[in-house]
Amino acid sequence: MNLLREYIREILLTESVDPKIMSMIDELEKNGGYAEVFPDRVILFQPTENTPRRWVAMVAYDTVVGAHAGGRCGGAESVVQSATAKTGLGPLAYDIAIELTGGLGMISDRASVSSDARAVWDYYMNNRPDVIKQQLDNTNDLLTPEKDDNCEQEIEGTGGTAVDMFPDNPRAWIKSSLSKLYKKSGTPVMDELRKRGMLR
């Protein structure tokens, strides 16, 4: 019986849109907006009379190999290169970008992350049961002997590697949302946007 409940829960999570993301879709639609997918970025537009292609949020990414992410990074498809939002719709752009990886996942920029972007990653780690979190290792194999999960971990500050920044507890960095790979098993956000005619 527990397995059946777990299975049903998993189906519901992969088929449903997070309520906060749904409210962002509603807001974008109310303002005549839409999402456009490019080979290297997702941009949310809210047109105005004077500016028909007025953008309000953007997440740009590169392949893990193209970004020289420093390892296989758990098989991640892409790494965020930059993100910006003029409104509170940034997380919607992130969700679309994660879904575009086809279940392979996305990681944060490996060199620097703004406080706004960190808040998005923290939210994914702590509040999004529909998003799969996978712990990454550093390039010195601190957590596992396997190489597939190795990924640069220098994003926790500017004093060397993440492990160097916690000399008394080298495993402390694993609590960081930036040391994870994030992926989704379905595309409910893109499906909802497509259903509303808001995905280009």
Locate the predicted segments by residue.
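A generic structural micro-environment signature
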Residues: 7-10, 86, 95, 199
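Protein-protein interaction and targeting regions used for scaffolding, dimerization, and localization
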Residues: 1-16
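Secondary-structure junction/capping motif
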Residues: 2-3, 88, 114
